[in-house]
Every structure is written in structure tokens, then in C-alpha cells.
């Protein structure tokens, strides 16, 4: 178990371990809880490892030509398989699986992890989380899992400043957003439900429409029901700063890396768990700029 706070560098540690395992002639599978995070990992690993002739492939529920990928895995034409829950499909056979990496381990159930472990007897397992589940910590206590703690963050990172406001103070918050936009900094605005325009409570759709009227085409949205192509386009536009305010559900909770995002707004905060809040707040500690997290109740 690699335990380290959000933004502490768990992914780069995993990448170095993975490269060493592949150098020894084995394959690696990395499982992430969401397609957005799996996509991000694929881009990151492919960029750094392809110059070393390490072949990375992605597999999710929406991947086309799955059978072709299965055949390539069995013939060891794929070194790293990155994906969501699809990677423990019973149809998948590895040539020589040496390491299983489970990112954001607290997001997966016990049976899901066991299914993956059954793919290769004696396979090493690396699990990563800023908020490990009690079951994993109990395994650490009894010596069944070794633990490595990353106790510091990369040099230059600043602590996020967290504040709590009432929903009646939204206008004051909007003024703060305008100041952030003047400095060309980006904003996440998180809500617990998607909703509709007719929703009585504040939901993703109603808040998006409100912000769209104020900030025009600087606002985008994403949630779990957005199709893969649109989700990838929105996230790329956010990375490219074509979108400056991203309204979202917790689909961006884990792993998303946008160094220019410095403000995290979480509305209806009483509807979220502590681990969720900690993960969400970690989305704005990715660069060297001062970041803020505003909780609205």
C-alpha cells in the first residue's frame, strides 16, 4: 500500500515500479475507478514510457475491438493494460502478469480486487490511496500488506485554504470567481446531483445554467451520463483553458490533474462524505499557485 495525500506523487512512484517490472519481462495491469482517470493515466504513461518502447493500451467498457486487445495481451504485445472495471473481465488472459496496480483503492470492492488477483498466481499487488479503507489498514496492522507512506508533497506546493459559507453568500463568491478569471485561473464547481431544469433544489444543470448566463462560453459541465467522446472533449477543453469553469458531479473526484485550477467549490456540502471532500479538495493542489476550497451549505 502506497499511502500519500492527494497530489503527493503516488502516480510517479507507481510508474517507476511499473517500468522496473516490465524491464524484468512481466506485464502490468493498472485499474482506475473512472474512465476520466483511466484516460489521464493512459496519456501520462504513454507519453513517458513509449520512448522506452513500452507498449501501453487502454480498456474500458466503451473500448472498441476488445477481442483484438485480448489477443495482443495473450501474445505479450501489450506491456501495460490501463482500464476501469473492464480489466477483470473473465475473457482476459495475460502472457505473464507480474504486477497489479489499483489506483484509488478505496473506490473498489473486495470481490473486484480478488477477481483481478486470480488472473495470476503469485502476482505482486500495488494499491494506492490517500484515504485507505479500514479493511486495508487492518491488513497492514496484521502484516498482510506492507505500507509505504509519502509524507511530503513536491516542493513549492501550497496548502489549500478551506472556508465554509452559506448559500445566501453566492454573489460574494461570484465576485471571487471573477477575480480568479482575471488572473486566468480555473475553477471546479461540484454538486451531488445532475437534476433537471425543473429541479427545486440546486443541481448540476440548474447551477450550470446560472453560471452560463454570467460567464457565457467560459463554462462547461461533465457528469457520469455524458458520453465518452463529449466527456473527453470537455476535459481536453478544460486542460487547454478553453473552458475556465467546470461544473461537475463527483466524477472528477479522483486523480484529475489540472495544475491551473485554483478554486474548488462544493455545493450542498452536507451531501458528501469526508473522504469525498478530501479527494475533491485535492483537485486544486496540483500547481504552485495558492488554492482555495469553498464549501457551501
PLM regions: where:
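Inter-lobe coupling/hinge segments of SF2-like helicase ATPases
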Residues: 1-297
Amino acid at each position: 500500500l502506497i499511502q500519500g495525500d492527494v497530489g503527493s506523487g503516488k502516480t510517479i512512484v507507481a510508474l517507476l515500479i511499473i517500468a522496473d517490472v516490465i524491464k524484468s519481462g512481466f506485464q502490468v495491469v493498472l485499474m482506475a475507478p473512472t474512465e476520466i482517470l483511466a484516460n489521464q493515466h493512459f496519456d501520462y504513461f504513454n507519453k513517458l514510457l513509449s520512448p522506452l518502447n513500452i507498449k501501453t493500451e487502454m480498456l474500458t467498457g466503451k473500448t472498441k475491438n476488445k477481442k483484438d486487445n485480448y489477443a495482443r495481451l495473450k501474445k505479450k504485445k501489450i506491456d501495460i493494460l490501463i482500464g476501469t472495471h473492464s480489466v477483470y473481465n473473465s475473457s482476459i488472459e495475460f502472457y505473464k502478469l507480474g504486477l497489479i496496480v489499483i489506483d484509488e483503492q478505496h473506490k473498489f470492492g473486495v470481490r473486484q480486487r480478488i477477481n483481478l488477483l486470480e488472473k495470476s498466481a503469485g502476482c505482486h499487488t500495488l494499491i494506492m490511496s490517500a484515504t485507505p479503507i479500514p479493511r486495508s489498514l487492518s491488513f497492514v496492522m496484521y502484516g498482510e500488506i506492507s505500507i509505504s507512506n509519502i509524507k511530503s508533497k513536491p516542493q513549492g506546493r501550497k496548502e489549500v485554504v478551506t472556508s465554509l459559507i452559506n448559500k445566501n453568500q453566492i454573489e460574494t463568491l461570484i465576485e471571487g470567481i471573477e477575480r480568479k478569471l482575471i488572473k486566468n485561473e480555473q475553477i471546479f464547481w461540484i454538486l451531488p446531483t445532475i437534476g433537471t431544469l425543473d429541479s427545486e433544489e440546486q443541481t448540476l444543470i440548474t447551477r450550470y445554467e446560472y453560471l452560463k448566463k454570467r460567464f457565457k462560453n467560459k463554462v462547461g459541465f461533465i457528469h457520469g451520463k455524458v458520453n465518452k467522446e463529449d466527456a473527453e472533449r470537455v476535459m481536453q477543453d478544460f486542460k487547454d483553458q478553453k473552458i475556465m469553469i467546470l461544473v461537475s458531479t463527483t466524477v472528477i473526484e479522483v486523480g484529475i490533474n489540472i495544475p491551473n485550477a485554483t478554486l474548488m467549490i462544493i455545493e450542498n456540502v452536507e451531501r458528501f462524505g469526508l473522504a469525498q471532500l478530501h479527494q475533491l479538495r485535492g483537485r486544486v493542489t496540483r500547481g504552485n499557485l495558492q488554492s482555495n476550497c469553498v464549501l457551501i451549505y
